[in-house]
Amino acid sequence: MTRETEYMKIALELAEKAREMGEVPVGAVVVFENRVIGKGFNKRESAQSPLSHAEIEAITEAAAYLRSWRLEDCELYVTLEPCIMCSGAIVQARIPKVYFGARDPKAGGVRSLYTLLEDERLNHRVEVVEGILAEESAELLSGFFREIREKQKLSKKQSESGNLE
């Protein structure tokens, strides 16, 4: 197993933790000198904060660990392509390399909709590696949303049958 796969597996475990909490299953880790120094998973629902994305959580923890906002010698591993907010945080943190699993066709800020991390107009550019455990990442997400749709259908049927009385 490559080190990239090893770190992405940790991110997937964090994504699973998010799923168990009813959060969109995205996980992220920041690695420094072959050690995980920051972990995060989506907490938007539990924190009721639009900023509580996995990447932001992991970057914040890593910055606290290093006592520096500059994460110049770190790598970020995330199960889903970062959005534009998280891409901005990656640039601001000066992270030089990002690995992600699945593309995000609705909100991707790295490849799908925008290429923010490689925009020459910014003062920092990031090397991007995509597709690490992409199938596993995508399946975790699609399974989560499938469960939500099934619960919504069941709830709708129950409310409709209750209204017929």
Predicted regions and their residues:
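Helix-adjacent hinge/juxtasegments
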Residues: 51-52, 56, 60-93
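Short beta-strand scaffold segments in enzyme catalytic cores
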Residues: 26-34
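Zinc-dependent deaminase
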Residues: 1-21, 85-165
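Short beta->alpha transition motifs characteristic of CBS
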Residues: 37-44
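Short, basic and Ser/Thr-rich N-terminal targeting/leader segments
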Residues: 22-26, 72
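Residues that line or immediately flank small-molecule/substrate-binding pockets and catalytic motifs
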Residues: 44, 78, 102
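Small-residue (primarily alanine) positions within well-ordered alpha-helices
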Residues: 11, 15-18, 28, 54, ...
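Short secondary-structure boundary/capping segments
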Residues: 28, 67-68, 118-120
